[in-house]
C-alpha cells in the first residue's frame, strides 16, 4: 500500500495565551522569502471555525497550519502532491517538513517564545481515503512498515502506535 498525502501534526506543549493571529505575519514572511523548496501561495484565517484549521499557509505542494482540530492546538503539515520513494521516505519527508516548520516558529522573535511544540507525541494521517481507507485491513497492511520506520527513527526508544477506528476519519 502506497502512502501519499501524509499529514503530520505536532502539538503545542503549552501556549494558552497564544493568539493565532500572531502567526499570520510570520506565514506571510515565509511566502515573501520563499524559505522552503516549495511554492507558498497565501494565508487563510479559519479561526472562526470551532476546533478547526486555524491559520493556514497554503502552498502548491503542501499546506502548513497552526490548527485547533480536535480542540488541540498544534502545527499540521499537509502534503498535497505526490512524493516519490518508499513509504518510509515519504514519512521522513513529511515529518522533516513539520519539524522544520515547528523549529522556525519556535525561533521567530515575533512570537516572543510563546510557542513550543512537543516532540513526544505526534499525529500522522493519510489525507487520501481512496488510497488508504481507514479500515483495520489498511492498518494491518502497513503497520509493520510504520513500526519499523519509528523504531529506526527513535533508535529503540519505546513508542506506542494507535489508530482511530472511525472509518469516517482519515487513516491515522
What would you call each of these model-derived segments?
Residues 4-8, 116-136:
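Short glycine-rich, basic-tinged beta-strand/loop micro-motifs
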Residues 133-155:
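Short, low-complexity, polybasic intrinsically disordered segments
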Residues 162-172:
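C-terminal edge-of-domain segments
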Residues 11-65:
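N-terminal low-complexity, intrinsically disordered segments
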Residues 35-38, 102-113, 154-157, 161:
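Long, hydrophobic, amphipathic alpha-helical segments used as structural scaffolds
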Residues 14-25, 85-89, 133-138:
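Short, conserved charged micro-motifs
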Residues 22-30, 83-109:
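Ampiphathic alpha-helical segments that act as solvent-exposed interaction surfaces
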Residues 61-89:
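Intrinsically disordered, low-complexity regulatory segments enriched in Ser/Thr/Pro
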Amino acid at each position: 500500500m502506497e502512502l501519499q498525502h501524509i499529514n503530520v501534526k505536532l502539538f503545542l506543549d503549552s501556549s494558552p495565551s497564544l493568539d493565532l493571529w500572531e502567526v499570520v505575519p510570520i506565514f506571510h514572511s515565509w511566502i515573501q522569502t520563499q524559505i522552503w523548496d516549495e511554492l507558498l501561495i497565501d494565508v487563510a484565517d479559519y479561526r472562526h471555525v470551532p476546533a478547526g484549521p486555524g491559520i493556514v499557509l497554503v502552498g502548491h505542494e503542501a499546506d502548513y497550519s497552526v490548527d485547533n482540530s480536535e480542540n488541540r492546538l498544534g502545527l499540521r503539515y499537509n502534503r498535497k502532491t505526490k512524493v516519490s520513494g518508499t513509504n518510509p521516505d515519504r514519512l521522513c519527508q513529511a515529518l522533516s517538513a513539520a519539524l522544520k516548520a515547528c523549529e522556525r516558529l519556535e525561533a521567530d522573535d515575533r512570537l516572543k517564545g510563546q510557542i513550543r511544540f512537543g516532540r513526544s507525541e505526534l499525529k500522522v494521517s493519510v489525507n487520501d481515503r481512496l488510497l488508504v481507507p481507514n479500515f483495520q485491513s489498511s492498518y494491518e497492511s502497513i503497520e509493520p512498515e510504520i513500526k519499523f520506520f519509528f523504531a529506526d527513527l527513535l533508535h529503540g526508544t519505546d513508542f506506542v502506535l494507535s489508530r482511530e477506528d472511525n472509518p469516517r476519519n482519515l487513516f491515522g
